[in-house]
Amino acid sequence: MSQLPGAPTPESHLCVACVQMRSGLEVGPNIDAASALIRRAADEGAELIATPEMTSLIDRKPGAVFAKSTTEDADPALAAFRQLASELNIWLLIGSLPIRVDQERCANRSFLIGPEGAIAARYDKIHMFDVQLNAGNIYRESAGFAAGSEAVVARTPKANVGLTVCYDLRFPHLYRDLAKAGAELIFAPAAFTRITGEAHWHVLLRARAIESGSFLIAPAQCGKHADGRETYGHSLIIGPWGEVLAEAGVEPGIIAARLDLKEVGEARAKIPSLTHDRTYRGAGL
């Protein structure tokens, strides 16, 4: 990533970065890998930095994530990232960590951390990816993770931000609701597979940005993981008109862009669809 210009930015401008990772089976090395990339992004001028879904651990073996997870107050990754945000004086969105919430399941939980190291917002992934493709190919995210039930918009000094995670991308009403609640920038950290990513990743993110008139910040997992999973990469930063402002490739690294938040109001003025919802009936509704 080329260094962001060092001149002071207008009040409406915000320098954001996505960290693209290939998280593995052990929490410690994943913390180290994420921290190194976060430091690099901060050194290059980013004020708000986001990491992907499951930053601290990817292990698809049944029960493995739960066995390696902890409660929020004991989570080593969360503690490390809170300290790092304070040290670097940045806003930090940790795409998600597995946080134990009962005796069998975790929450797939995002954390927005402020520059003093305090947790400004939490969001538990609402939509669980449960699918049976054939008799031998079944994936049930809900077996290991408890679904969230609350949409979240957080207020920061420069922008109102909405929080989502991965599979949430396929539910456009969530993004419209976040925008209606004031979100100007929406995070979509993810771990899309290579197959679904190639087919849908760019289309979904651009559509959600256009529909909501919001910036979309989508840090991704990438490549062949130690557990055998293959994720798509291609972290994206997208403007409210649907334009791609920055895109990663298929290797770990960072991308960045300088956002002008005035563009949110401009896009919504040109296409004011957020104010044009109507009730309707028919089609069996």
PLM features per residue range, with description:
Residues 2-3, 11, 221-285:
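C-terminal beta-strand edge segments of enzyme domains
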Residues 73-94, 160, 166-255:
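CN hydrolase (nitrilase-like) catalytic-core segments centered on the catalytic cysteine
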Residues 57, 111, 122-129, 236, ...:
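Short beta->alpha transition motifs characteristic of CBS
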Residues 1-48, 66:
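N-terminal glycine-/serine-/threonine-rich phosphate-binding loop
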Residues 6-16, 153-162, 185:
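Beta-strand-turn-beta hairpins that frame and shape the catalytic cleft
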Residues 20-22, 52, 124, 220:
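Residue-level recognition of beta-strand->loop/alpha-helix junctions
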Residues 27, 35-116, 122, 192-211:
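Cys-nucleophile CN-hydrolase/nitrilase-fold catalytic domain and related Cys-dependent amidase chemistry
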Residues 101-181, 194-203, 269-273:
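Active-site catalytic loop in hydrolytic enzyme cores
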